[in-house]
Amino acid sequence: MGFTEKQEALVNSSWELFKQNPSYSVLFYTIILKKAPAAKGMFSFLKDSAEVVDSPKLQAHAEKVFGMVHDSAIQLRASGEVVLGDATLGAIHIQKGVVDPHFVVVKEALLETIKEASGEKWSEELSTAWEVAYEGLASAIKKAMN
């Protein structure tokens, strides 16, 4: 079964909730560093600070990550596959030392952040929609890394 219209709608509506509150970007990176403290050095906007501090670069990167997952949902619904819009993503992830467990940490942080942003609208169905969209994106990035 492919990505459904309802799944796309769930991702779209919760993406809008995420974008409305910049504090969700800080939450996202706080969760990542709680799960994988060593990942701090992978992010230029985090490596020189003692804790996660809001900044334009942090906001831009979080919006890019969540935006790419959102775009993946649209692509999965339209064509059943995710094609990276940025051909350098594989090389960037290699350069930063990203390995499979990092993708799991980011997925968990993404889902926890969307759960917080969605509030009472959170459901297993919503979680699954984001998870499938993220897995599509992660798979495309991993493919570009090889």
From Swiss-Prot:
InterPro entries: Globin, Globin-like_sf, Globin/Proto, Leghaemoglobin-like, Leghaemoglobin_Fe_BS. The keyword Calcium does not apply. Keywords: Cytoplasm, Heme, Iron, Metal-binding, Nitration, Nitrogen fixation, Nodulation, Nucleus, Oxygen transport, Phosphoprotein, Transport. Induction: Strongly reduced levels in boron-deficient nodules. Inhibited by abscisic acid (ABA) in parallel with lower nitrogen fixation in nodules. SUPFAM superfamilies: Globin-like. GO terms for biological process: nodulation; response to abscisic acid. GO terms for cellular component: cytosol; nucleus. O2 binds at residue 61. Heme b binds at residues 44, 64, 93, 96. Root nodules. It comes from the Eukaryota. GO terms for molecular function: heme binding; metal ion binding; oxygen binding; oxygen carrier activity. Gene3D superfamilies: Globins. The modification Nitrated tyrosine is found at residues 24, 29, 134. Residues 2-146 form the Globin domain. Its main location: cytoplasm. Transmembrane segments: none annotated. It is found in: Cytoplasm, Cytosol; Nucleus. The modification Phosphoserine is found at residue 44. Belongs to the plant globin family. Leghemoglobin that reversibly binds oxygen O(2) through a pentacoordinated heme iron. In root nodules, facilitates the diffusion of oxygen to the bacteroids while preventing the bacterial nitrogenase from being inactivated by buffering dioxygen, nitric oxide and carbon monoxide, and promoting the formation of reactive oxygen species (ROS, e.g. H(2)O(2)). This role is essential for symbiotic nitrogen fixation (SNF). Monomer. This is Leghemoglobin Lb120-34.
